[in-house]
Amino acid sequence: MTAQLELVLRKYDLELTPDEQVTIWDEVAFYHEVNQSYFDQDEDEALGSPQEDERLIYEIEDLVDSCITKESKTRTITFSEDQLWIIHDVLREKEELYSSTYDRYQDEDDLEVVDKEGNLIGIWGDIYKKIKEAINGQH
């Protein structure tokens, strides 16, 4: 008796405004830039899969609009589960950074990104909520 391995690729549809698309592009590109040393590592030296993560980042950048034009519109974009987790991790890292700096310095400018409890707000919070709902199966 032979066992068959079935590969299940989970896909998630997110309805994103032009602003949300540009924000995702900006955040993922910035994350890629500031973590370049991780992406430059050999697979056997790194924790994780730098080349795979970098490939996913390029795919995300290809899916969303990088700038708003007069033709920009809200679109439903289909992401793979791995792509969605990359965006989730990028936003979670932003949330952790801004909440920790607000806790230390009480800088009101940080409150444009996180609330006093340290949760993402504004466009970042909207995107983060959509991703968490998609991953958790809530529509």
Each model region followed by its residue ranges:
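Positively charged, low-complexity terminal tracts
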Residues: 1-139
